């Protein structure tokens, strides 16, 4: 296989198909892989519909999600594409972040127009911070009436605008089924769709370009050298002799300097996103720092105790609660590396939340946690995961 050597030369982008069930998300995913395989045979494998539809189960933060990953390349980019076939799977994926998306293809059947799930998916995409959506008007071969298809296009644009997405986003008329059958007109439509994806979904900001952050997993003392904190660098880069702050869990933030970076017992000049490293910290005692805090570039992250979040609560079958919960529910919220107890306030008019529901909640934590909007967490009771969510708004 001539696959490996292309990997690093192109920008890598994560995308996914979203939209109402039966509008053809999975068929379109299969059509994209086939069309790109035929166009760039040395870069791509073709994937049949049933290979994608029989999505393997994944566990993310204790929640089982059926999700398919395929990869393919255009001449400009390398794509990782996720397709969550079921509606519930899609919702769970979006909230738990099993697959982050840099952009999404909203699939709308030209024969139906936007449906309730179409709206729900676009709303969720907005809430979880998907940066860009463009549209594939699928089954366009089945609509002869030009006015009808223009009406559907207008409706979809209004839907995007209502959630602050680009109203002028490309809307490409496709037929996934006809493209899979090799009909030249519709093969070309899928090629045009991918050209639009290349052109309209912005290049993602690489993790290494973001400000440095490392969650503390462990702390120990090296005699004669000082205190070392270990963890996996979440984002950014850390160089020896750079100043950092230790944030969260405790009321005050501590400033210090990184005097050494090691990985696999070797000293490095630098640690970067994805590395598991130990950081030697100047003038810090073993008891000054603990698991659950984060080491960050000064001034980039602040600790908070009150936030609003969007959560998915596991059903009984998924190993979740057997009973609903009410206002003032007090579980633990697992952020990055540690549990912090919090009190839940339900939205006005919501009396209780049932297992299997997704809902918005307000939370007041008993200790501050370093957080930004978009940070994901698990909800646990005595170490057992009962839900997952993400921070949508910081209150205090």
Swiss-Prot record:
**Pfam families (alphabetical):** GTP_EFTU (PF00009), GTP_EFTU_D2 (PF03144), GTP_EFTU_D3 (PF03143)
This enzyme's EC code(s)? 3.6.5.3
Q: Where is this region: G5?
A: 175-177
Task: State the PROSITE patterns in the record.
Answer: G_TR_1, G_TR_2
Report the InterPro entries cross-referenced here: EF-Tu_GTP-bd (IPR041709), EF-Tu_GTPase (IPR050055), EFTu-like_2 (IPR004161), EFTU_2 (IPR033720), G_TR_CS (IPR031157), P-loop_NTPase (IPR027417), Small_GTP-bd (IPR005225), T_Tr_GTP-bd_dom (IPR000795)
Q: NCBIfam families given for it?
A: EF-Tu, PRK00049.1, PRK12735.1, PRK12736.1, small_GTP
- Role description: GTP hydrolase that promotes the GTP-dependent binding of aminoacyl-tRNA to the A-site of ribosomes during protein biosynthesis.
Which HAMAP family does this UniProt record tie to the protein?
A: EF_Tu_B
The name under which this protein is listed is Elongation factor Tu
- Source organism per entry reads Mycolicibacterium smegmatis (strain ATCC 700084 / mc(2)155) (Mycobacterium smegmatis)
């Amino acid at each position: 296989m001539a696959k490996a050597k292309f990997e690093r030369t192109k920008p890598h982008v994560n995308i996914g198909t979203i939209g109402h069930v039966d509008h053809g998300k999975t068929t379109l995913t299969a059509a994209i892989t086939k069309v790109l395989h035929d166009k760039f045979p040395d870069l791509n494998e073709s994937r049949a519909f049933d290979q994608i539809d029989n999505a393997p189960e994944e566990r993310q933060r204790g929640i089982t999600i059926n999700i398919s990953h395929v990869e393919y390349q255009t001449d400009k980019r390398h794509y990782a594409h996720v397709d969550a076939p079921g509606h519930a799977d899609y919702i769970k994926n979006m909230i738990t972040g099993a697959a982050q998306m840099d952009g999404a293809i909203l699939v709308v059947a030209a024969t139906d127009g936007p449906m309730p799930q179409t709206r729900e998916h676009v709303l969720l995409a907005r809430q979880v911070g998907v940066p860009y959506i463009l549209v594939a008007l699928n089954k366009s071969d089945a609509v002869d009436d030009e006015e009808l298809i223009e009406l559907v296009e207008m409706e979809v644009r209004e839907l995007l605008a209502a959630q602050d997405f680009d109203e002028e986003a490309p809307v490409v008329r496709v037929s996934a089924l006809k493209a899979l059958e090799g009909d030249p007109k519709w093969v070309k439509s899928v090629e045009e769709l991918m050209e639009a994806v290349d052109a309209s979904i912005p290049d993602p900001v690489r993790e290494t370009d973001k400000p440095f952050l490392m969650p503390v997993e462990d702390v120990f003392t090296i005699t004669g050298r000082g205190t070392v904190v270990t963890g996996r660098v979440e984002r950014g880069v850390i160089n020896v002799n750079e100043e950092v702050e230790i944030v969260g869990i405790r009321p005050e933030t501590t400033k210090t300097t990184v005097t050494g970076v090691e990985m696999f017992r070797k000293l490095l000049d630098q640690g970067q996103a994805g590395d598991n490293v130990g950081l030697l910290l100047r003038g810090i005692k073993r008891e000054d720092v603990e698991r659950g805090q984060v080491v960050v570039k000064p001034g980039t992250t602040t600790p908070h105790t009150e936030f609003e979040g969007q959560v998915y609560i596991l059903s009984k079958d998924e190993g979740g609660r057997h009973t609903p919960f009410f206002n003032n529910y007090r579980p633990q919220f697992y952020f990055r590396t540690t549990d912090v107890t919090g009190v839940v306030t339900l939205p006005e008019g919501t009396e209780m939340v049932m297992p299997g529901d997704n809902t918005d909640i307000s939370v007041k934590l008993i200790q501050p946690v370093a957080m930004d909007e978009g940070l994901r967490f698990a909800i646990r009771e005595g170490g057992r995961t009962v839900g997952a969510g993400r921070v949508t708004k910081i209150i205090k």
